[in-house]
């Protein structure tokens, strides 16, 4: 028998002896899916019931225990709470013995869940298969921590058949052995370290000193013994309130109406300096007296209600200010890839994600408790699903599964982790569409057609957040009557077991309402139990509040569900405070007081009618004065060259400073500041600094007094979208940067360009246009027609040239010829220039010795060239541009094929992995290379950052490399045009019989080594350019050329053969260097 089966067959009165079991079992019993939520206090062995049983009925604890064993304990054995309790017992038993990774804990829990299932049972076969595939995908992989720490060979385990009886037994034995090894690792290493860490952390907290003293007393006390025996004095707490009829459904609705829905995100932090009383020990008659100015309390009951409302209000304020890590957000526990062999009929296997009911998903009073119940059903062992299964309600079961899968999809969607979520979210969305929304598999679910269509269209993309709450609300409405029937059936069996009565008479005493403070405490207990059950899937570092909370938890008086009302904040008499003290303690109240005082002043002040006019003088500044004001500034020097476009201005430091002063004179410097700020964000590599920079940009340009359109002087629609976004990404800001840059170029660049004298060619073109404008209209029309015809001919010739280029690249030999030409362009000393010691931008003649000693150590001299558009490129990267352009075209072809596959419903995970692999290869080779420089193509830095940001965000479309294609394409066409001209010239001269003076190809590295350093011995050396080399001495073969007249002076000598152990791409593995 497994441990869960042993627990299920043990008498509950024996299990409740254990304080740890009572704590886990109380958490399970308080889940909101159940109607009756009893609570057991270990200290006085007393049960507290909610809803309470009427006073005329006598509740017996033996009947209650029988009902718990029949209706609650079997579901508890199926939950993660039970498996964590078993692991906790293993730890405790190890601690009490004389001896004394998170991933190992996950593996132990998952293996325990698998070993507790009978795989031959047809009803749970799909669930068993899904758990097994999840185990393979997460922990049984080569190189995983579990396999490494357990020192197991998993090949034999992975090759076992799933359904073969003998092999199933073998699998159980192997998993059981691995589980024992993992438990030993946890007990022998992680648990002692955890206890050491716990003692050191709790010793720093003052609230934990009493707990530490008790621990030391028990540790060193020899006479300390555990008090055993059965709790024969077990009892049930008496009822304090009179009610006509017992109904958990009505009690839930009353509680939901009394509790404010805004308190759904309420944190349950305890007082650090006081131990709170559990719900059962809270006295409902206790009064909270609060003195407020100019208010008279009508009665003590009104005082309690108002104080509780304030308590909840300020608890929300404190929770928002503290932002404690214990607050549970939507996070997805899945970070691994799901096996592609998972069948669609298998229910998704997921650890319960930590969910918080957000204010965005607000339900009505009638559906609020159903929303909580459906959240808790999976954590409680699916009792509501089991009820629907007994009634054979297949459609309702499918609706419940859809609700829980949508809840899990929402948690994956809102997860803040980045690695792997895009693929899993896409797969989960496709699976939901295929399993629930596909009309070909079965009948359509009874949801609205608009909701189904919205889910179908937006689930795979992830933009489905508005449709998930709508679909869940429709499902809640349809499951509401069945859930009420489930609660009624629970009430029937509970009363039958506990009181031996099936019906309750309606004759009762006067009705008394339950206080609101009790409902708040009860709601906190229910919410805490749900959060604890969902939090078992994720383990995080505890903050100081959680360590202090451990000190206040007593397993005998509530344990983990020990809750209390948060102490009110700022509930002091504000009339006795000075205004400065009020501003310091409560700024919001101080502002409100100022507003009230001003309102009273306006009401009492005499009204005087007067008119006020504001006369604004208009400044008329001529263009010549603006030029002079700019020229008068001595700090900013006017550049000498006239810029051709705005990109040149932004890339040139001197132009940028002068352009900034130009915009400052015209009060239009804010758009340029935005461009500079976004450029800093795109360069920044630290995520925290990048987030802070983005927040500063949003506060400065989108949350100011003026509208963002006026500040940025741009009317792009994306500005309004960014202003309404909660989370703004870097790629979105880069997109807006392009729009703002275009707006600046349209409004101000022409005026800025007019500050500089035009080029000679521009003057000629302007003169021709002025002369032609004076000619008759017929001549002008003829000229326009001819120029249009010439333009079309040039366009046709350009398209033909590009088509010829693509055909040329398909032939490997011709492609190699083009690459050889690009190598020759490196030696073009007329047009190339180096930028090693030249910062002015003027061309400098390249050095004759390109392969210098510095280059031997890996310092490559970058050769530059100015092409059309006055763009400066690196000639060294021309071949890389050729390959980069080709790889980007191949990626776009993959995107097109993936789109066609998606239309034909043949799109799967392999296509996504293939495209991601292609993107990673392009990134590693050209944009983020391991060999300096990292950027090895002629693409601007901001364009590279935009591509990396798009890859990080998970985009898989043509827009990823669109900007890079537009940057590299002119470079490739420039060299292609020159290559065609060079080839035609060479063919013509060869045809005429003339010699064609070709530039020498780049010389191969002929490195000379001093023979005195190595002699006849082998040498091992390392350079950044060629890596590790093995140099061996060899005899040089005397050639026929050396036997000539000059060979008299040439003596046979040693040469060095260099074998490269780690060759660079494009070089041979081994070669021999010879000297002549």
Curated annotation (Swiss-Prot):
Principal location: membrane
Pfam families tied to this protein: RGS
Cellular compartments annotated: Membrane
Protein name: Regulator of G-protein signaling protein-like
Membrane-related topology note: Single-pass membrane protein
Disulfide bonds: none
Biased composition regions of type Polar residues, renumbered to the chain: 834-852
Keyword Lipoprotein: no
Organism name: Homo sapiens
Gene Ontology cellular-component annotations: membrane
Keywords: Membrane, Transmembrane, Transmembrane helix
Chain positions covered by the region annotation Disordered: 834-854
RGS domain residues: 645-764
InterPro entries reported in the protein's UniProt record: RGS, RGS_domain-containing, RGS_sf, RGS_subdomain_2
Transmembrane segment boundaries: 960-982
């Amino acid at each position: 028998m497994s441990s869960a089966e042993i627990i299920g067959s043990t008498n509950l009165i024996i299990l409740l002896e254990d304080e740890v079991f009572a704590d886990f079992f109380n958490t399970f019993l308080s889940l909101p899916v159940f109607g009756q939520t009893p609570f057991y206090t270990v200290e006085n062995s007393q049960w507290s019931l909610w809803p309470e049983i009427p006073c005329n009925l006598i509740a017996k604890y033996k009947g209650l225990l029988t009902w718990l064993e029949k209706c609650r304990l079997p579901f508890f054995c199926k939950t993660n709470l039970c498996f964590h309790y078993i692991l906790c017992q293993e730890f405790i038993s190890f601690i009490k013995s004389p001896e004394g990774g998170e991933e190992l804990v996950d593996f132990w829990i998952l293996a325990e869940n698998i070993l507790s299932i009978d795989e031959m049972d047809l009803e749970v076969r799909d669930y068993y298969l899904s758990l097994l595939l999840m185990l393979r995908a997460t922990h049984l992989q080569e190189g995983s921590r579990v396999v490494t720490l357990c020192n197991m060979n998993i090949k034999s385990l992975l090759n076992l058949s799933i359904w073969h009886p003998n092999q199933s037994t073998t699998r159980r034995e192997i998993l059981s052995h691995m589980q024992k090894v993992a438990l030993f690792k946890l007990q022998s290493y992680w648990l002692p370290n955890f206890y050491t860490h716990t003692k050191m952390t709790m010793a720093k907290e003052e609230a934990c000193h009493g707990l530490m003293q008790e621990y030391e007393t028990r540790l060193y006390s020899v006479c300390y013994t555990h008090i055993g025996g059965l709790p024969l004095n077990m009892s049930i707490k008496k009822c304090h309130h009179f009610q006509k009829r017992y109904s958990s459904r009505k009690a839930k609705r009353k509680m939901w109406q009394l509790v404010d829905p805004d308190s759904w995100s309420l944190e349950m932090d305890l007082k650090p300096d006081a131990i709170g009383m559990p719900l059962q020990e809270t006295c409902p008659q206790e009064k909270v007296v609060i003195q407020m100015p100019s208010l008279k309390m009508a009665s003590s009951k009104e005082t309690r209600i108002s104080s509780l409302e304030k308590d909840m209000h300020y608890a929300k304020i404190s929770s928002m200010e503290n932002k404690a890590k214990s607050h549970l957000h939507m996070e997805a526990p899945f970070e691994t890839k799901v096996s592609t062999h998972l069948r669609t009929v298998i229910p998704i296997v997921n650890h319960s994600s930590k969910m918080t009911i957000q204010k965005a998903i607000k339900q009505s009073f009638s559906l609020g408790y159903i929303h909580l119940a459906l959240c808790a059903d999976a954590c409680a062992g699916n009792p509501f699903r089991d009820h629907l299964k007994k009634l054979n309600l297949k459609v309702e079961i499918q609706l419940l599964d859809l609700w829980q899968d949508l809840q899990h999809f929402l948690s994956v969607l809102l997860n803040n982790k980045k690695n792997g979520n895009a693929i899993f979210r896409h797969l989960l969305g496709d699976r939901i569409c295929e399993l629930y929304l596909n009309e070909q598999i079965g009948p359509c679910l009874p949801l609205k057609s608009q909701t189904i269509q919205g889910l179908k269209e937006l689930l795979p993309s992830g933009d489905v957040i508005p449709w998930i709450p709508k679909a869940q609300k429709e499902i809640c409405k349809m499951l509401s009557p069945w859930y009420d029937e489930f609660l009624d059936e629970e009430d029937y069996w509970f009363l039958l077991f506990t009181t031996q009565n099936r019906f309750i008479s309606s004759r009762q005493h006067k009705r008394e309402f339950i206080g609101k403070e009790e409902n708040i405490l009860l709601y906190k207990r229910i919410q805490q139990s749900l959060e604890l059950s969902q939090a078992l899937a994720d383990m995080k570092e505890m903050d100081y509040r959680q360590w202090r909370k451990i000190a206040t938890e007593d397993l005998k008086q509530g344990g983990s569900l020990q809750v209390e009302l948060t102490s009110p904040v700022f509930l002091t008499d504000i009339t006795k405070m000075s205004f400065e003290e009020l501003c310091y303690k409560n700024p919001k109240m101080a502002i409100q007081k100022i507003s009230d005082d001003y309102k009273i002043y306006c009401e009492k002040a005499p009204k005087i009618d007067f008119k006020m006019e504001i006369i604004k003088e208009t400044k008329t500044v001529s263009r010549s004065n603006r030029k002079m004001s700019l020229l008068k500034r001595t700090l900013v020097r006017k550049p000498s060259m006239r810029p051709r476009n705005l990109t040149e201005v932004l890339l040139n430091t001197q132009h940028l400073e002068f352009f900034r002063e130009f915009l400052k004179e015209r009060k239009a410097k804010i758009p340029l500041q935005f461009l500079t700020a976004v450029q800093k964000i795109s360069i920044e590599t630290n995520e925290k600094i990048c987030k802070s920079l983005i927040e500063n940009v949003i506060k400065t340009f989108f949350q100011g007094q003026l509208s963002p359109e006026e500040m940025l002087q741009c009317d792009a629609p994306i500005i309004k979208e960014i202003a309404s976004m909660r989370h703004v990404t870097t790629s979105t800001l880069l997109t807006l940067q392009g729009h703002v840059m275009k707006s600046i170029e349209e409004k101000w660049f022409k005026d800025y360009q007019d500050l500089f004298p035009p080029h000679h060619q521009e003057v000629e073109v302007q003169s021709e246009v002025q002369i032609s404008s004076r000619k008759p209209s017929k001549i002008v029309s003829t000229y326009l027609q001819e120029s249009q015809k010439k333009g079309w001919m040039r366009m046709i010739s350009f398209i033909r040239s590009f088509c010829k280029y693509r055909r040329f690249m398909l032939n490997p030999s011709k492609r190699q010829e083009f690459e050889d030409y690009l190598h020759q362009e490196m030696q073009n000393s007329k047009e190339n220039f180096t930028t090693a010691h030249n910062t002015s931008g003027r061309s400098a003649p390249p050095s004759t010795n390109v392969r210098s000693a510095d280059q031997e150590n890996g310092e490559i001299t970058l050769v530059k060239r100015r092409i059309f558009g006055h763009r400066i490129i690196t000639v060294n990267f021309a071949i890389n541009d050729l390959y980069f352009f080709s790889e980007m075209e191949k990626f776009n072809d993959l995107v097109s094929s993936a789109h066609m596959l998606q239309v034909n419903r043949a799109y799967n995970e392999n296509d996504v992995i293939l495209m991601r692999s292609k993107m990673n290869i392009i990134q590693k080779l050209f944009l983020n290379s391991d060999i300096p420089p990292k950027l090895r193509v002629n693409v601007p830095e901001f364009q590279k950052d935009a591509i990396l940001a798009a890859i990080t965000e998970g985009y898989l479309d043509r827009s990823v490399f669109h900007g890079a294609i537009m940057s590299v394409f002119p470079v490739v066409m420039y060299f292609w045009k020159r290559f065609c001209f060079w080839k035609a010239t060479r063919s013509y001269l060869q045809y005429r019989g003339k010699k064609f003076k070709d530039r020498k190809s780049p010389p191969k590295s002929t490195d000379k080594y001093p023979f005195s350093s190595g002699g006849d011995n082998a040498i091992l050396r390392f350079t950044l350019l060629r890596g590790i080399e093995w140099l061996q001495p060899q005899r040089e073969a005397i050639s026929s050329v050396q036997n000539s007249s000059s060979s008299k002076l040439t003596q046979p000598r040693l040469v060095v053969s260099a074998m490269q152990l780690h060759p660079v791409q494009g070089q041979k593995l081994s070669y021999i260097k010879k000297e002549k």
